[in-house]
Amino acid sequence: MDSTLGLEIIEVVEQAAIASAKWMGKGEKNTADQVAVEAMRERMNKIHMRGRIVIGEGERDDAPMLYIGEEVGICTREDAKSFCNPDELVEIDIAVDPCEGTNLVAYGQNGSMAVLAISEKGGLFAAPDFYMKKLAAPPAAKGHVDIDKSATENLKILSDCLNRSIEELVVVVMDRPRHKELIQEIRNAGARVRLISDGDVSAAISCAFSGTNIHALMGIGAAPEGVISAAAMRCLGGHFQGQLIYDPEVVKTGLIGESREGNLERLASMGIKNPDQVYNCEELACGETVLFAACGITPGTLMEGVRFFHGGVRTQSLVISSQSSTARFVDTVHMKESPKVIQLH
């Protein structure tokens, strides 16, 4: 993939974040999502690529979405043959969440961001809109903790890997009734729990950075966001495992289908032969090159949110690549009026 693509996808998430941030605190989560989708689609369609959405968003709550299978990029146009050389063109798979944490935006809460991951065709796992059991941990614990182990066992391993006492560890868990026993087990083991209402992509990624005071993500969340988290952790060298949840009784909702049997049939129709398989980040994001980008909508652990000022907007983004050992935080001032105004603080 072209090295300039990293800069292009930063602009994609920036535009989505800016559009969504205008609806921060207005209680309109679907509108905040809709404008982010439209802004993301518009910017992606200006990139010299043939992209295909393999992880979309919005299916669970019938919100607007960049639908699975949608093609984006200049080279998907009908007249593309005149300016896109097929011999030089790389087909790209894209996983998106234009507004990760729609409720967070709607109610003015921290932790929402616009995110996407890209790889060459076939490089990202096309996860169904199911739930996924997840385990994320820092690079030092990669291959040592395991999703099949209990939370208590993993905390002991994590303590050894990080050279910290269990009491110093902080585990992020989504605040859901299904996690009642998990939360109690973590607390009984001596670790601390940080409950979040939404936005587990940010929590997963934060495990890979020192100084965030987040040492693990545990529990069940959405599978599509699991693939995006895995792409980021693949780039960062962190630990991520995911296992699809196909039994509605596990999460006590009907959001993943009416029956266990029906869900198993759906997975089989998608070519998933072992529904109980545990995937690591190299399997969920298996491409030779994986790029991840995010832009804060509201303030979060890693990035500031969008800040509006007279004459412009300021954003903070993150871009990482599996091909390099760098995580670039990009602070951008978008000047909107003349004379140009740059606000530094």
Swiss-Prot record:
Q: Where does Mn(2+) 1 bind?
A: D33, E57
Q: Under which pathway is this protein filed? A: Carbohydrate biosynthesis; Calvin cycle
Q: Which GO terms describe its biological process?
A: fructose 1,6-bisphosphate metabolic process; gluconeogenesis; glycerol metabolic process; reductive pentose-phosphate cycle
The superkingdom of the source organism is Bacteria
> Which UniProt keyword terms apply here?
Calvin cycle, Carbohydrate metabolism, Hydrolase, Manganese, Metal-binding
The cofactors it requires, by name, are: Mn(2+)
Q: Which residues bind substrate?
A: E100, G101, T102, Y131, R176, P177, R178, D198, G199, D200
Which E.C. number(s) belong to this protein?
3.1.3.11, 3.1.3.37
Amino-acid positions noted as binding Mn(2+) 2 in the UniProt annotation, renumbered to this chain: D97, E100, E225
Q: Give one GO term, molecular function aspect.
A: sedoheptulose-bisphosphatase activity
As for family, the record states: Belongs to the FBPase class 2 family.
Known partners and oligomeric status: Homotetramer.
Function in brief: Catalyzes the hydrolysis of fructose 1,6-bisphosphate (Fru 1,6-P2) and sedoheptulose 1,7-bisphosphate (Sed 1,7-P2) to fructose 6-phosphate and sedoheptulose 7-phosphate, respectively.
Q: What name does UniProt use for this protein? A: D-fructose 1,6-bisphosphatase class 2/sedoheptulose 1,7-bisphosphatase
Q: Which organism is it from?
A: Synechocystis sp. (strain ATCC 27184 / PCC 6803 / Kazusa)
Upper taxonomic classification of the species? Bacteria, Bacillati, Cyanobacteriota, Cyanophyceae, Synechococcales
